[in-house]
Structure formats: C-alpha cells, structure tokens
Amino acid sequence: LELGVDVFLLQADLLNDNETLSLFDKCKKLIKRPVNLLINNASIFEYDNIKTATLESWSRHQKSNLQVPFFLTQKFAEQAPEPDKLENGELESRSCIINIIDQRVQNLTTDFTTYTLAKSALWTLTRISAKALAPKIRVNAVGPGPTLKAEFQSISNYKKQRLSTPLQRGSSTSEICETIKYLSL
C-alpha cells in the first residue's frame, strides 16, 4: 500500500525507564524532525479489585497507564515546535497528544480497580496537560467503550458489557481510529 508517508517502527519495554525515555531520541534520529503526534495507548489491563490488588498490580498499572504517558508527554513537549501564526493573528498548533483512556473513568465498577485508578489519573493528566501545553500542543483523550473481547471474558459477558453503555453498543476499532485521525488534524 503506497500512502506517500514514511513509517518507522520503534520498540521499547515501557516498564523499563531507560527504554521509555530513549524513544524520542531514537525517533528524532530516524525522522530528522520534531515528532508532531504522540498517542499514549500502551496499557496494562489486569484484573484486580479493592480486596485483591497488590503493590505489584498497583505499580504495573500506574507505571504503564500514567507514569509512562506523563514522561513521554514531557519529552514530546521539549521537542515540539512553536505554533504557527495565522494571517488573522491566531495561533495554530502543529503538535498533538492523544491519550487513550477508558470509559471506566466515567462508568466506575468495582473490578479492575488499579487499572481504573490509573486511567482516571491519565484523564486528569490530559486536562492538566491541555492547559499547561497550550497553545503549542493540543492535548485530547479518547475514552472508548468495550471494543475487543478480553481474553478471559465470556462472550455473554462481553455482549452484556457492550449493551451496558449509554449508547447500548461498544466501539469499533475503526471508529476509534477515525476519532484519533480527526483529533490529530
């Protein structure tokens, strides 16, 4: 498929601080210009609840779902270009961060407690970053509902979960991609 764009694949263990923090340096070497889009989507999603959560489950969820996006946001902001000035004097950002949160931040349950706490904090980080980094960087979040059946989830539970949303349906991956595409323009 020929789209007329260059694509570079980078891999890092995001639970490893050195690998995480070196991503932008590796990326800048490859593309030879500032990175203009950051999508914080990497995530750990493991079951626990208030009774079964451990220090390890807490740490893994906080690190992958909050700490890594926070420091990637910092690195992104350091290298993002200044916004363009339009003819009418208004500014237009050339950089965008999109955090993938979860519908659970608005639709709380007693399951996946440490995951939900971390994603809720990522939603807060999104709002703080949007204010702190404007007008240089636009920061948004997408909080999809049930999209893919979890490995451990029964089909009937998955269908029930999709029907429990306000629209009584889940999200499709193509809808999420179209939303991200729109927000990143």
Predicted regions and their residues:
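Conserved SDR Rossmann-fold cofactor-binding beta-strand/turn motif
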Residues: R138-L148
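Catalytic loop of short-chain dehydrogenase/reductase
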Residues: K85-A134, P146
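C-terminal helical subdomain
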Residues: A141, K160-L185
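A short, exposed helix-loop element centered on a Lys and neighboring polar residues
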Residues: T73-Q74, R127
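Conserved NAD(P)H cofactor-binding loop of Rossmann-fold oxidoreductase domains
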Residues: N41-E46
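The beta1-alpha1 cofactor-binding region of Rossmann-like NAD(H)/NADP(H)-dependent oxidoreductases
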Residues: Q11-S22, L55, S174
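Substrate-binding pocket helix/loop in short-chain dehydrogenase/reductase
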Residues: N49-I50, T54-Q62, Q161
